[in-house]
Curated annotation (Swiss-Prot):
GO terms for cellular component: small ribosomal subunit. InterPro entries: Ribosomal_uS7 (IPR000235), Ribosomal_uS7_bac/org-type (IPR005717), Ribosomal_uS7_CS (IPR020606), Ribosomal_uS7_dom (IPR023798), Ribosomal_uS7_dom_sf (IPR036823). PANTHER family: RIBOSOMAL PROTEIN S7. The gene is rpsG. PROSITE patterns: RIBOSOMAL_S7. This is Small ribosomal subunit protein uS7. One of its GO terms (biological process) is translation. Pfam families: Ribosomal_S7. Belongs to the universal ribosomal protein uS7 family.
Length: 156
């Protein structure tokens, strides 16, 4: 254990257009090489596209999509007597949100559309409707946890 005190959590400023902290965190994760203006442009263009297609509040749809991706349980490796077990553990809310953001971005980057904004809007629409690669990733995590339920007594 570290002897130093735990650093306090940094307050993330909400995004300038919608005033949403989670959206700001999403942009920070999407950003490459410190180019925040590019990341903002991608996210705002994607949200405009979603608004035009779905005729709903884009920020609400974004939150619905993230909630559909958030995992409740995941498996973590635990060594017990020379064997490594995949032990299912519950996911803390902060980690669930971080995983959902990460999975959403990686699923969007893997899509075939031409621009990143188009890929992201497509993945947002899919995730809001409980389909797409990001939702599949969450279901895989839940399936792994269910398959390894026998080892849940090794939790720490």
């Amino acid at each position: 254990m570290s002897r130093r005190r735990r650093p306090e959590k940094r307050e993330i400023l909400p995004d300038p257009k919608f005033g949403d902290q989670v959206l700001s965190k999403f942009m920070n994760n999407l950003m490459l090489d410190g180019k925040k203006a590019v990341a903002e442009g991608i996210v705002y263009t994607a949200l405009d596209t979603v608004e035009a297609k779905a005729k709903t509040d884009p920020v609400q749809l974004f939150h619905d999509a993230l909630n559909n991706i958030k995992p409740q349980v995941e498996v973590r490796s635990r060594r017990v007597g020379g064997a490594t077990y995949q032990v299912p553990v519950e996911v803390r809310p902060e980690r669930a949100q971080a995983l959902a953001i990460r999975w959403m971005i990686s699923a969007a980057r893997g899509r075939p559309e031409t621009t990143m904004a188009a890929r992201l809007s497509g993945e947002l629409m899919d995730a809001a409707n409980n389909r797409g690669n990001a939702v599949k990733k969450r279901e895989d995590a839940h399936r792994m946890a269910e398959a390894n339920r026998a080892f849940s007594h090794y939790r720490w």
